[in-house]
Structure formats: structure tokens, C-alpha cells
């Protein structure tokens, strides 16, 4: 009998393979053919174009075990995960599909046969639903399969609109859809609930296990239902639900996969109660997070990356609730790979990247989690009523990185609701402030609306005749301008490249007899190209013909930098992993800036490897080839596209040997060898999960190398050596410095011992305890600890507080002998003093240090110490 999840997956695929179906691998969780979907959320997603007749396959029957995520967008189960028996962010959808091959009867028969013969489920435990008008499905179930009429339930439009029914399936607001028939399993009368369609249908007794969709229509945005070219079948059965039945449990969280993950999470965190709901959340979330990262999604503040971040942070919060004190979430990945078996093939290949990304995100959130939870706890304790205000929810989001649903999750546990409307208002106000700041000093011409088109000739020429079709000054259309006027000039055709895709706009001149217009920038205005600049001499008017001349040197240098970003992108993906994707770029004549997704700083060795890889491709002198083709053809060829960019149906593809292929409308060199040299000048993080590389090429790269060489030679001269001996000389100097620092520390200890002898006499006795409170002048902060140790030895049973003020900063130390820490703790003592000098600190009960930023308050703060100690020694 098939019992484990892995056995069920294999049995399902084998059943349909033996019935003429092609076994197709699960597609990525990032839909490749549907921009309307955030994540793959059903088995049919990868076949959408097949159902629409737009994609031809060499098979008409298929079966899959599809990985799915439902978190964000229309299908969003995140809020319920952990609180119900069957909600998940990640699940596997077993499915069989017919593309114009078999239809209702065969689809129904396949489902019934697999359940009752292969899995041997008792027929009396099964009932089915159909759409209210689907008489054909009723006849098949009743007459041909033999299901009693009373076990066939008709479901009408129960969601307030036509075709809005549990038994009329649609993937989204538009697209393939049709009536469906669902198979339900009766878990028994010991569980509350009624049959589908009854008042008690929301109970957990009758559970839907298989949905058989009869794809007959393509729903338009207008709501019109157009017949599909060929009626088809799409079915889906959640593997978690059927596994629960086969393993004799009621909750999905009791099946083998979740038992393993829950036990491992409990072991890592140190929890003994395996029924904790937080363990369910963690076990569910590791599946969605790990597989999303394996499919190229990285935590970020937008789109898919933000949904991933929300899920990770929700899991981390639940771990914190269970008592986790260090990063734990990433440690579940090996167990996940083991328990998922064949379904984790892609995950196993990217295991190291997945673990690093999860750990980095977890550690980043841990820095603000405790403080954020503290603020939330205070707000909830002080709350009057049952609603947390939107301002507080926004503050937690904006300052501490708490997604709203994480705050709502905490509130839910205390029967508090969040003011979502208030949160959205606060968000809108922040966007308005950001927009206002961004518009400060804005160019009047930036918002021009130009109803014209400019043809671009700059791929093949840098100069050519053109006719002026419009002129704008200060946002207003004019017919002519005179010498000295600043304006935007629009031409009917231009070799000037308008800023786009990170490449800056061209500079140059528009010239005619006695006329020279200096172009300082080129921008797109809809379909028109605007040449921004100033008229140096003569007069210009609409209708005039000019010679448009691009600055060749600037264009050439820009092209070097643009072409190398393609090589850099490919090299980063090769060295760091295929999760790397471009997040932004700036390409100008002087340098290039490339932003990309990555979860940690790029190591020096990795940067060196990337740089060498790019320079190798430059030396290979690949010819750059460009081609216009359909977007689907480009993607089939493996062309990289920027996430979030909108592309036309026809795109331009730039290829550099077999190393790089990208969609790009920019201008490029003829061969990679033209770039000459590539040199990385810096690498840094600019946002969570986003890194930035700055680099130079060609002559600028040579100048950079020459500058580094000059600095190396200058350093060599200072060290009285040559460039070849700099490292050895510097190492010797550092060793000498360390020795001097060691000797200095020893000298300070001796001075501290001498100073302590003088200070002992300043101690006062409080209830038999020596108490020394002293502000020290001219004493280095680094000497305080040694001085405190000396004083403790001399005073024996003692409490000591020392403070110094230097360069606008306060340094404090408190020491308490071991016999007194039951009454006075050094950490509490130093924290009290630090709070009065604008600082904070802490440490052990016997010794603690702190700092502050208000030296003017040090005397008053130290004056509070004796009463504080006296009270505790009383």
C-alpha cells in the first residue's frame, strides 16, 4: 500500500504514465509565461498557452507533481498557515491534463480508478460535486461510474456573481476556465462537519481531495466566455491531503513530511511540545522559502522578493516565540531535501545558496526583531480597545522591518485586530513625502507630454539630417528659439540615444548654417526623443532641417561600459549562482554601476574571479550580434530579461559568443575586444539583498591601474623599499606596532597600579562596604578595566564606579566584588549612570562598561551613585 508522500507521488505519476500521459517536470515557482501571476499556484500554470492553443507540444496528455506557492496575490493562504489543518504557503499539486484529447468521461474515470483501485479508498467514503447545470457530468458519475445520485451534489453560483462558484474554476480574472467536479473524502462522523453544499460544509469532516476541471472557456477581461479551441482537462489533487488519508491522520501537519520537519525544528530550537502551532508555521514556511530561493527569488522589498521576506520573517518570529536565540531556520534545509526526495532535486543542487540566503535574512531581521517586539508588546499592553492603530503598525514596518501581516499575526494571538486602513494611509503619506522630495527642483521639461514620434537611427550612424518637429521651453511648446535659450528640441529622426535601460542619453550638437545647438542630454517623451540643451549661436525654428551629430568619443566610452555590464551579469551568475539578477544599472562615459541581487557581501576571491572571467571574454574578442525576434523566441534561446521590465512582443537580443545573451535596446561595441580592460573599483551593499559593483573600462581602467601602481610605488618609498617588497615591509611594520602596543598596555597596567594606590584613599564605607566613585581626568578609556581590577584587589569587598570624559564622549566602568553581587549588580549600576549621560551599556554582575554622549552631565550622574548604592546595601 502506498503510504509515504514519496510513494504516493510515484504511484500517481506512474498510473498516468501507464495511461498514455507524458510525465512533465514541475515548472519553476516563478511563472515563465504569465505576467499576471506572482507565483505558480496550480499545476495548469505551465500549460496555459497550450490550453489557449498558442503553444504546441508533442503530447496531448500530461501528468505532473507541481510545486505551488500561495502567498500574496489572489490566492493567499499566509494568514491561515499554522492555525488550520490544511492551509499552506507551499504544497504539491498532483495533476493530469488533456489538451484536446480526452474530456469529461475519461477524466472522471481516471480519477475514480486511481482513488478506488490503485489507492483502494472505500467508495462509501467518497462523494462528488458538479456545477449546477452540468448534466453531462451527472450522467457520467451516476450511470457510467455508478455513484449514487444522493452522493452527487450540484453546486450553483454561491459567490454573488455568474460563474462565481466553488464548481466553476478559473485561474484568475481572465484566462482558461470551466465547470469542475470535485471529489470529497469523509473522515468520519467523529469529526464535525457536513457534506458540501450543506450548512455545515465548513467543518472538517468532508475534505476535497481532487478537483477535475473541464476547460471549455477563455474568460475575457469583459467577462465574456469564449470557447477554447479544443475542450481540455485540468485536474489537481493536493498531495498533502491524500497523504493524510493514506497515513490515517486528519491534519496535513501529521503526515510524514511535516512530522520530520516539525521534529527537526523542535530539536534545533529546543522545544519538547511537538503540538506547538509555531512549529507548524516553521515547518510549512521552510518549504516555500527554500524552494523559492532555489527558483531564483531572493528576499527584497518588492514583488516576489518581498513576499519571500514576509514568509521568512514570519517563521523567524515564531522561532523567537518558541525561544530560539540564534539563527535556526536555515538549518532545516538538509532535512527538507531528505524528506522531499525526488521532488527536491533542484533544491539539492542549490542547497548552499539557499542556506546562505536564509541565514543572511534571518540574521538581518534578528537585529531589529527584539526591539520591534518590545515596542509592539508595550503598545498592546497600553491598548484601550481591540484595534491596534495604523500608525504603530506602520512604525513597526518602516523602522523595524515588520511586515504588516507579521504584526497582525502577533495581534491575532492576543485577539487584537490591526487597523489596515490606517496603515495604508500612513504608507500613502510616506509615498507622498518621497514623491514631493523627488520632485523638489524638478525640471519643467521632465513632465512634457509630446504627441510625436522620433525614429532612431543611432544603431548604425552617429550623424544625419533631421527635421525639427517641435521645440519646448519651460514645459511650453514654442515655434522658435534664439541664441542663449535653453530648450528641448524634437526631431523626426535622430542618431541620439535617449536615456533608457541604465544607459545615459547622448550628447552632441544640432547644427545648420550659422546655427549650433549644444545637446547636453537626450530623453524619451513617449514615442518622441527630446534633445535637451542650449542654443549657442543663431536661431532655430520648427520645420528647420539640421545636422544631428552625436559626440563620438562619449558614445564610444558609454558603449564600452554598457557592453561590459552584460559580461559582468553573466560572470556574476556563473560565480555566485543563478539567483543573481540585475536590479538596476547606470552606464555613462566615465564608469558603470551595476546593482544585483545577492544575500551577502561578495568575497575578494569571488570579485577577482568575476573580474578575470569578464577580461577573458574581452580577450576572446567575441563579435556582438543583435537580432530582432518575438519575446517568446528570445526566452526560449535563454535571453536574460530584467524582472519588472515590460517588453514589447518584438524585442532586441544582444549576444556575445556563448557567454551572454540578453534583451537590450542599448548601444554596444562591435566586438568584446573593443572594451580593452575591465576593472572593478568597488563593491558594497545598497539595500537588503542588493549589492552594487562599480567599475571602469578601456582607457579609464588603464588610468585606474596606473593610479594604483603610483600609489603602490609611493607606499614603497615611504616604507623605504620597492613595489615588490611592500607587503613584506608592511607586515614587518605591523608586527612592530603590535609589539609596541603590547609594551604600552603593560606600561598602562603599571600606571594603573600606581594610580590605584592613590585612589584607594578616596573610598568611603557604606554599611561596611568600600565604595569608590571617581571621575578621572587624563585617563584613557582602555585603561579603565585594568584600573578597576587593581582597585578591586586592594579594596577587597567593594563597589567601584569610574568615569572619564574625552572628546565629547563618556566612558564608564562599574565593578562589584563577588560577595556583593547578590545586592548590587554592575550591569544595573552602570546602566543607571549611562542613562543620565545619553548612553547605554551592560555586562556581567561583577563588571560592566558603558558609554555616553553627554560629558557635561557626568558629574551629576556620578553624584547619583552613592544614594543608589546606599539604598541597596541598607
Curated annotation (Swiss-Prot):
Q: Which domain of life is it from?
A: Bacteria
For biological process, the GO terms are: alanyl-tRNA aminoacylation; negative regulation of DNA-templated transcription
What stretch or stretches form a coiled coil here? none
Q: Which GO terms describe its molecular function?
A: alanine-tRNA ligase activity; aminoacyl-tRNA deacylase activity; ATP binding; tRNA binding; zinc ion binding
InterPro entries, A to Z: aa-tRNA-synth_II/BPL/LPL, Ala-tRNA-lgiase_IIc, Ala-tRNA-ligase_IIc_anticod-bd, Ala-tRNA-synth_IIc_core, Ala-tRNA-synth_IIc_N, Ala-tRNA_ligase, Ala_tRNA_ligase_euk/bac, DHHA1_dom
Annotated Zn(2+) binding sites: 562, 566, 664, 668
Alphabetical keyword list? Aminoacyl-tRNA synthetase, ATP-binding, Cytoplasm, Ligase, Metal-binding, Nucleotide-binding, Protein biosynthesis, RNA-binding, tRNA-binding, Zinc
Q: Which cofactor does it need?
A: Zn(2+)
Where in or outside the cell it occurs: the entry states:
Cytoplasm
Share the domain note from the entry: Consists of three domains; the N-terminal catalytic domain, the editing domain and the C-terminal C-Ala domain. The editing domain removes incorrectly charged amino acids, while the C-Ala domain, along with tRNA(Ala), serves as a bridge to cooperatively bring together the editing and aminoacylation centers thus stimulating deacylation of misacylated tRNAs.
Q: Which NCBIfam families match?
A: alaS
Q: By what name is this protein known?
A: Alanine--tRNA ligase
Q: Which organism is it from?
A: Shewanella baltica (strain OS155 / ATCC BAA-1091)
Amino acid at each position: 500500500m502506498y503510504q509515504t508522500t514519496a510513494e504516493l507521488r510515484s504511484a500517481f505519476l506512474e498510473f498516468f504514465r501507464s495511461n498514455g500521459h507524458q510525465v512533465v517536470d514541475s515548472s519553476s515557482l516563478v511563472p515563465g509565461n504569465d505576467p499576471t501571476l506572482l507565483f505558480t499556484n496550480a499545476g495548469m500554470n505551465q500549460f496555459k498557452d497550450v490550453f489557449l492553443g498558442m503553444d504546441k507540444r508533442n503530447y496531448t496528455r500530461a501528468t505532473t507533481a507541481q510545486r505551488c506557492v500561495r502567498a500574496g496575490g489572489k490566492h493567499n493562504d499566509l494568514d491561515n498557515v499554522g492555525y488550520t489543518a490544511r492551509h499552506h504557503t507551499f504544497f504539491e499539486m498532483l495533476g493530469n491534463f488533456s489538451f484536446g484529447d480526452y474530456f469529461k468521461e475519461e477524466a472522471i474515470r481516471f480519477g475514480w480508478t486511481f482513488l478506488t483501485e490503485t489507492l483502494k479508498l472505500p467508495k462509501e467514503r467518497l462523494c462528488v460535486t458538479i456545477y449546477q447545470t452540468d448534466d453531462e457530468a451527472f450522467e457520467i458519475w451516476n450511470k457510467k461510474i455508478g455513484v449514487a445520485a444522493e452522493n452527487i451534489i450540484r453546486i450553483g453560483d454561491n459567490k454573488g456573481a455568474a460563474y462565481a462558484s466553488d464548481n466553476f474554476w478559473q485561474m484568475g480574472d481572465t484566462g482558461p476556465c470551466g465547470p469542475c467536479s470535485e471529489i470529497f473524502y469523509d473522515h468520519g462522523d467523529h469529526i464535525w462537519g457536513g457534506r458540501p453544499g450543506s450548512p455545515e460544509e465548513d467543518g472538517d469532516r468532508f475534505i476535497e481531495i481532487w478537483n477535475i476541471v473541464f476547460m471549455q472557456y477563455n474568460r475575457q477581461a469583459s467577462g465574456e466566455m469564449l470557447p477554447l479551441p479544443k475542450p481540455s482537462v485540468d485536474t489537481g489533487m493536493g498531495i498533502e491531503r491524500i497523504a493524510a488519508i493514506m497515513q490515517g491522520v486528519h491534519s496535513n501537519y501529521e503526515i510524514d513530511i511535516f512530522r520530520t520537519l516539525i521534529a527537526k525544528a523542535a530539536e534545533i530550537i529546543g522545544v519538547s511540545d511537538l503540538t506547538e502551532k509555531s512549529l507548524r508555521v516553521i515547518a510549512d514556511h521552510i518549504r516555500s522559502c527554500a524552494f523559492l530561493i532555489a527558483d531564483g527569488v531572493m528576499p527584497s522589498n518588492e514583488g516576489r522578493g518581498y513576499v519571500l521576506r514576509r514568509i521568512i520573517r514570519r517563521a523567524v518570529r515564531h522561532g523567537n516565540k518558541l525561544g530560539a536565540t540564534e539563527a535556526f531556520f536555515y538549518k532545516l534545509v538538509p532535512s527538507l531535501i531528505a524528506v522531499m526526495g525526488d521532488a527536491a532535486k533542484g533544491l539539492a543542487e542549490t542547497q548552499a545558496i539557499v542556506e546562505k540566503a536564509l541565514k543572511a535574512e534571518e540574521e538581518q531581521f534578528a537585529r531589529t526583531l527584539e526591539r520591534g517586539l518590545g515596542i509592539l508588546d508595550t503598545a498592546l499592553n497600553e491598548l484601550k480597545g481591540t484595534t491596534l492603530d495604523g500608525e504603530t503598525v506602520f512604525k513597526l514596518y518602516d523602522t523595524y522591518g515588520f511586515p504588516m501581516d507579521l504584526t497582525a499575526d502577533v495581534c491575532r494571538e492576543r485577539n487584537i485586530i490591526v487597523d489596515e486602513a490606517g496603515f495604508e494611509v500612513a504608507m500613502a503619506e510616506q509615498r507622498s513625502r518621497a514623491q514631493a522630495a523627488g520632485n523638489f527642483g524638478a525640471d519643467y521639461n521632465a513632465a512634457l507630454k509630446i504627441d510625436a514620434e522620433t525614429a532612431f537611427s543611432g544603431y548604425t550612424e552617429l550623424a544625419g539630417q533631421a527635421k525639427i518637429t517641435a521645440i519646448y521651453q519651460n514645459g511650453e511648446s514654442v515655434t522658435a528659439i534664439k541664441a542663449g535659450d535653453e530648450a528641448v528640441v524634437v526631431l523626426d529622426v535622430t542618431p541620439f540615444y535617449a536615456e533608457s535601460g541604465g544607459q545615459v542619453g547622448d550628447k552632441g550638437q544640432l547644427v545648420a548654417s550659422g546655427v549650433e545647438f549644444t545637446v547636453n542630454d537626450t530623453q524619451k517623451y513617449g514615442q518622441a526623443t527630446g534633445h535637451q540643451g542650449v542654443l549657442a549661436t543663431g536661431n532655430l525654428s520648427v520645420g528647420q532641417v539640421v545636422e544631428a551629430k552625436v559626440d563620438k568619443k562619449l558614445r564610444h566610452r558609454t558603449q564600452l561600459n554598457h557592453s561590459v555590464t552584460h559580461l559582468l551579469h553573466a560572470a556574476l551568475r556563473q560565480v555566485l549562482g543563478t539567483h543573481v539578477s540585475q536590479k538596476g544599472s547606470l552606464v555613462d562615459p566615465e564608469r558603470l554601476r551595476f546593482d544585483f541581487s545577492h544575500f551577502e557581501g561578495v568575497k575578494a576571491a569571488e570579485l577577482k574571479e568575476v573580474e578575470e572571467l569578464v577580461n577573458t571574454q574581452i580577450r576572446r574578442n567575441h563579435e556582438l550580434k543583435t537580432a530582432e525576434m518575438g519575446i517568446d523566441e528570445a526566452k526560449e534561446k535563454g535571453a536574460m530579461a530584467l524582472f519588472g521590465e515590460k517588453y514589447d512582443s518584438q524585442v532586441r537580443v544582444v549576444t556575445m559568443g556563448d557567454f551572454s545573451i540578453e534583451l537590450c535596446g542599448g548601444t554596444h561595441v562591435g566586438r568584446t575586444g573593443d572594451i580593452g580592460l575591465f576593472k572593478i573599483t568597488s563593491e558594497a551593499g545598497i539595500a537588503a539583498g542588493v549589492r552594487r559593483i562599480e567599475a571602469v573600462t578601456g582607457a579609464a581602467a588603464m588610468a585606474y591601474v596606473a593610479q594604483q601602481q603610483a600609489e603602490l610605488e609611493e607606499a614603497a618609498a615611504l616604507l623605504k623599499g620597492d613595489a615588490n617588497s611592500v607587503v613584506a615591509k608592511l607586515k614587518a611594520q605591523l608586527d612592530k606596532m603590535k609589539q609596541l602596543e603590547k609594551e604600552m598596555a603593560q606600561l598602562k597596567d603599571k600606571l594603573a597600579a600606581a594610580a590605584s594606590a592613590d585612589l584607594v584613599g578616596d573610598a568611603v564605607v557604606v554599611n561596611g562596604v568600600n565604595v569608590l566613585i571617581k571621575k578621572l581626568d587624563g585617563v584613557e578609556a582602555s585603561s579603565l578595566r585594568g584600573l578597576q581590577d587593581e582597585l578591586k584587589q586592594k579594596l577587597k569587598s567593594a563597589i567601584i564606579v569610574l568615569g572619564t570624559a574625552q572628546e565629547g564622549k563618556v566612558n564608564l566602568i562599574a565593578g562589584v566584588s563577588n560577595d556583593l553581587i547578590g545586592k548590587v549588580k554592575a550591569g544595573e549600576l552602570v546602566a543607571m549612570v549611562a542613562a543620565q549621560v545619553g548612553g547605554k551599556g551592560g555586562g556581567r554582575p561583577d563588571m560592566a562598561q558603558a558609554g555616553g554622549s553627554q560629558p557635561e552631565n557626568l558629574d551629576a550622574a556620578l553624584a547619583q551613585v552613592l544614594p543608589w548604592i546606599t539604598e541597596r546595601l541598607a
